[in-house]
Curated annotation (Swiss-Prot):
Name of the protein this chain belongs to: Transcription initiation factor IIF subunit alpha
Cellular location(s): Nucleus
Gene3D superfamilies, A to Z: Winged helix-like DNA-binding domain superfamily/Winged helix DNA-binding domain
Alphabetical UniProt keywords: DNA-binding, Nucleus, Transcription, Transcription regulation
Annotated family: Belongs to the TFIIF alpha subunit family.
Bias-annotated ranges (Polar residues): 450-459
UniProt record, GO biological process: positive regulation of transcription elongation by RNA polymerase II; transcription initiation at RNA polymerase II promoter
Organism of origin: Arabidopsis thaliana
GO molecular function: DNA binding
GO cellular component: nucleus
Start and end residues of each stretch annotated as Disordered: 201-480
UniProt feature, compositional bias: Acidic residues: 229-247, 274-283, 293-308, 323-335, 355-371
Comp. bias regions, Pro residues: 396-410
């Protein structure tokens, strides 16, 4: 017991008698505050000179009394759950073994190593405890009682981990996933880098089917060739595209060179009698054994599924591209227009107002445009003679063709033209009128044609007569939106949304000034109101709407009503209220208010009316009907002014 720590009754520094500790050299008795100060200042012991670095305290440990209870230690890695009594969760602990079965002693011994399952009643939180330590390990629980510890033997130590609510992969499944990830993520990239660095000779060049004599059975597959790089360079240079260049280099490594001749398209997309059904031939010795990969996991070329993708036949060109090539050949043979000539023709057509027919006939082929070129040039000559010169119009060359007065030999399928003896002129003008209501550009063009036709000969004026109606409507549809037009639209349809109203005048709301004027008119004459379906729509502020009729009559009636309606109503006077009360003796409050309801709109009007009523009238109960009526307070003969007004009325 000589080595035991002997503490004095008080601290040597401050004299405190509570919370005492001994120094590491066991010579000094210090409280916690003085010991912390000496450790921070690196003070030394007064007797031995040892620097004070820590404080110690000794306890007696005794064995616990024998009991039948078994104790276990549980360690929670992710944090201790809420085990308080007041918590809402109720926890249960069980072994991960089948329930309700009888086990032998040997089976029970094996089941001791099974993990514990700790879960709450909701099943949301679940922990699994695994046995920690070896079978011969011994654990004790140190529980402090008074000033000594009690050592309680514990059976086992369990580490509890939270059970994941998602599916967990096994070790084999995880390895397979990582292998596929490496193969698809960077294996293909590394293989491509290796092929690019070493060139096509890495896998060996093969002969083209054409040079090998078109032998059957091999399906276009040849043998290794030392001079195959020149042909590959020729194919790449013919394409001139980066993507196709990569594709060509890849196919050259696999022995699948594409034929460069365009006159053998009938034989298939690749040319020749290539048989792609023979998988054994396609996956032959040249591909599998010429290149030896050092890394088996990242040998992308050894994957049979990926080899099938690489050996797949080339997708044929779309029919549109093939059609364009045929058209170019036909143009060269027949001496038609080139691409620059077509672009010039389109620009001339747009300048002469022919872009309408271009939009309607976008799906026509180039061959039809070539056959109708003479007719189109004739119509452009006539329309150019009718129109006045415009500053921003480009200079138009005069193409050769028949004279202006003679009709063309063939009618154009893709272009519209006005003829002198055309019997279908009114119907075409109606269709054009319907289009011009939604197309401001076409309306401006027709208006310009109409003004020019008035100064020409009578026969030309008859030609442009069907276009006069859309021209007049287009002239009215230009400029800022007026208040009358907005009123007419709101009266046509009771429930008009803001989006529908804006779409009506979208063509005329181009500038910022037009939009601001439109918004100001809307705030002035309309308001937002909700219907039964909680949808907002725009309505006029006036309650009564005119009867349906023509647009002009509606606007005129609306203007008359707005002019007749007084701008500001006068206040109700005392003489007027007296006059009403004397006309009818038994008048209720509601009836009196209804007489002047139209003039009681503002708070000022209502306050003045109430003040006059309190001054000259009072409520009196009618004995016959048990109702309160309004009567004058003086209940005398009316004033002379009142009698005079009554006689006049």
């Amino acid at each position: 017991m000589s080595n035991c720590l002997q503490l004095n009754t008080s601290c040597v520094g401050c004299g405190s008698q509570s919370d005492l500790y001994g120094s590491s050299c066991r010579h000094m008795t210090l409280c916690l505050k003085c010991g912390r100060t000496m450790a921070q200042n690196k003070s030394k012991c007064h007797e031995c000179g040892t620097v004070v670095t820590r404080l110690i305290r000794e306890y007696n440990v005794r064995a616990a009394a024998p009991t039948d209870k078994n104790y276990f230690i549980g360690r929670f890695v992710t944090g201790l759950p809420n085990f308080k009594k007041g918590s809402e969760n109720k926890w249960s602990l069980r072994k991960d073994i089948p329930q309700g079965r009888q086990f032998t002693d040997a089976q029970r011994e094996k089941l001791k190593n099974k993990p514990w399952i700790l879960e709450d009643e909701t099943g949301q939180f679940q922990y699994q405890g695994h046995l920690e330590g070896s079978q011969s390990a011994t654990y004790y629980l140190l529980v402090m009682q008074n000033k000594e510890f009690v050592a309680i033997p514990a059976g086992s130590w369990y580490n509890f981990n939270k059970v994941a609510q998602y599916k967990q992969l096994t070790l084999e499944e995880a390895e397979e996933k990582m292998k596929n990830r490496r193969k698809t993520a960077d294996g293909y990239q590394r293989w491509m880098m290796k092929a690019a660095n070493n060139g096509p000779a890495l896998f060996g060049e093969v002969d083209n089917e054409k040079e090998s004599g078109g032998t059957s059975g091999g399906g276009g597959r040849g043998r290794k060739k030392s001079s195959g790089g020149d042909e590959e360079e020729g194919n790449v240079s013919d394409r001139g595209d980066e993507d196709e260049e990569e594709e060509a280099s890849r196919k050259s490594r696999l022995g699948l060179n594409r034929k460069s001749n365009d006159d053998d398209d009938e034989e298939g997309p690749r040319g020749g009698d290539l048989d792609m059904d023979d998988d054994d031939i396609e996956k032959g010795d040249d591909w599998e054994h010429e290149e030896i990969f050092t890394d088996d996991d990242e040998a992308v070329g050894n994957d049979p599924e990926e080899r099938e993708d690489l050996l797949a036949p080339e997708i044929p060109a779309p029919p549109e591209i093939k059609q364009d090539e045929d058209d170019e050949e036909n143009e060269e043979e027949e001496g038609g227009l080139s691409k620059s000539g077509k672009e010039l023709k389109k620009l001339l057509g747009k300048a002469n107002g022919l872009d309408e027919s271009d939009e309607d006939d976008d799906d026509d082929s180039d061959d039809e445009e070539e056959t109708n070129y003479g007719t189109v040039t004739n119509s452009k000559q006539k329309e150019a003679a009718k129109e006045e010169p415009v500053d921003n119009a480009p200079a138009k060359p005069a193409p050769s063709g028949p004279p202006r007065g003679t009709p063309p030999a063939k009618p154009s399928k893709g272009k519209r033209k006005l003829n002198d003896g055309d019997s279908k002129k009114p119907s075409s003008s109606v269709q054009k009128k319907v289009k011009t209501e939604n197309d401001p550009k076409s309306s401006l063009k027709e208006e310009r044609a109409n003004t020019v036709s008035k100064s020409n000969t009578p026969t030309k004026a008859v030609k442009a007569e069907p276009a006069s109606a859309p021209a007049s409507s287009s002239s009215a549809a230009t400029g800022p939106v007026t208040e009358d037009e907005i009123r007419a639209v709101l009266m046509e349809k009771k429930q008009v949304t803001t989006q529908d109203l804006v779409s009506r005048f979208k063509a005329r709301l181009k500038t910022k000034e037009d939009k601001n004027a439109f918004a100001n008119i809307l705030r002035k004459i309309s308001k937002i109101q909700k219907n039964a379906g909680s949808q907002n729509f725009v309505v006029l502020r006036e309650k009564c709407q005119p009867k349906p009729g023509k647009r002009e009559s509606r606007v005129n009636k609306l203007n008359i009503r707005s002019n007749l309606q007084p701008r500001k109503m006068e206040l109700v006077t005392e003489d007027e209220i007296r006059k009403v009360l004397m006309e009818k003796k038994q008048l209720t409050t509601l009836e009196l208010v209804m007489r002047f309801k139209e003039r009681l709109t503002t708070t000022e009007d209502k306050d003045s009316f109430s003040h006059i009523l309190k001054k000259i009238a009072k409520l009196q109960k009618n004995p016959g009907s048990e109702k309160f009526v309004v009567v004058l307070r003086d209940n005398v003969t009316p004033l002379a002014s009142d009698l005079t007004r009554l006689s006049i009325s």
